[in-house]
Amino acid sequence: PTSLAHLVTENLHTLGVDEFHLVGNSLGGWICLEMAASYPENVKSITALAPAGLWLTPFTSRYPGEVALRFMASGVEKLAPSALNYTWAKKIGFETVSPRWRELSYELCLDATNAMAGSTGYFPAWDALLGKRFDKQITASIPTTIIFGDSDHTLPFKTCQERSLAPIHAKWIVLPQTGHVPMWDSPNEVTSEIMSTTGVIK
């Protein structure tokens, strides 16, 4: 996560973007936190959606559920366009990710399946975070909002949502009927919090 934070920041500087609001989900949320810790003069706000890294005891091996989902996606990529028309297939793929899996659109499910199947960097990225957690300080001058869902089975409350590791000034929100991808389950609420955190609305 730290090296990715440096890489993203370097790429933004190359593009001439020196100040930015950050929004990221899961590993992306962790990267946002790392960027703010390392480049406080550049980061204007953070909205971290179910960020990884907020665990007291870091993972030492690949999370079994994530391994299963990755292999499942790889195995059904060619079948997905037809299979996802059926409720049973949608349930297998998305029930653990979203409590509102029935409401997810066909297009979203297909895109997510194809993205997972084609993500050659998935396991290298996962392996790179083993034994690590987010444990840095972020200045209180950077508005920070952390959003988790109450039904996040990927980063569950008991082990992966440690508030003591979050910036002390962070606004911490738990959305109802929401899983590991809050922008899927609660898009209006997530959008509202992003706008509030960035200062677009008060």
Task: Show the residue positions of the predicted features.
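Conserved alpha/beta-hydrolase catalytic His-Asp/Glu region
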Residues: P81-I138
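Short helix immediately C-terminal to the catalytic nucleophile in hydrolase catalytic domains
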Residues: G28, C32-A36
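Active-site loop/oxyanion-hole signature of alpha/beta-hydrolase fold enzymes
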Residues: P1-L27, F59, S192
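Flexible "cap/lid" loop of the alpha/beta hydrolase fold
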Residues: A37, K44-E77
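Catalytic histidine-centered segment of alpha/beta-hydrolase-like enzymes
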Residues: T154, L175-T191
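Active-site acidic short loop of glycosyltransferases
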Residues: H13-E19, P40-E41, S141-I142, H169
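Conserved serine/cysteine hydrolase catalytic core
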Residues: G118-L165
